[in-house]
Amino acid sequence: DALRTVAPAFRMRVEGMRGVTLDALTIDLYTGKASCLKCGAAPSYLKTGGGVTTLAGETLPIGLMQSPEEAEPIPLRMLHGDLFVMLSDGVSDGADDGWVQKIVTERAGDSPKDIAARLVAAAEKRGASDDMTALVVRLERRKPAV
């Protein structure tokens, strides 16, 4: 619904504008059902007990799409301890993501904040020159109140 609201505003082209990317994740905290919506965004990563899965959308950036219905949500299932990683294209150039998967796998026990910082630092070492954003979410069971 939010995409239907904002898409028309971004269709109004500004000279030199390449389009606006959208990377969104919704999680039902009771069931673990999740949905990822990617419109021109860099790949995201889901770390589960079975390894790391790269999630890449085929949808154009907002403003370049003809209709919001072009955006296809990616259905996911998250369990306790799973990580979801979103990166801006300044961090992930999309060509070689082996280094991202390696960091996420090796550092899965670290805090989400530390994993995000490590991803940005590694991108800087790789010579990334664009703005860099990393968001890492870990799904955890609620701890009982003491």
Spell out what each predicted region is.
Residues 3-4, 9-10, 23, 77-87, ...:
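C-terminal catalytic subdomain
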Residues 39-40, 57-58, 100:
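Residue-level structural signal for beta-strand termini and adjacent loop
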Residues 16-24, 28, 53-96, 128:
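Acidic loop->beta-strand submotif enriched in PP2C/PPM serine/threonine phosphatases
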Residues 38, 48, 66, 98-99:
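Short, flexible helix/strand-to-coil boundary loops that buttress conserved ligand/catalytic motifs
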Residues 34-38, 53-56, 145-146:
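Amphipathic coiled-coil signal-relay and dimerization helices
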Residues 1-49, 71, 123-129, 136-137:
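Catalytic core of PPM/PP2C metal-dependent serine/threonine phosphatase domains
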Residues 43, 51, 59, 141:
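Residue-level detector of flexible, active-site-proximal loop/helix-junction positions
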Residues 30-31, 48-52, 105-113:
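Short, glycine- and charge-enriched coil/turn segments that flank and shape catalytic ligand pockets
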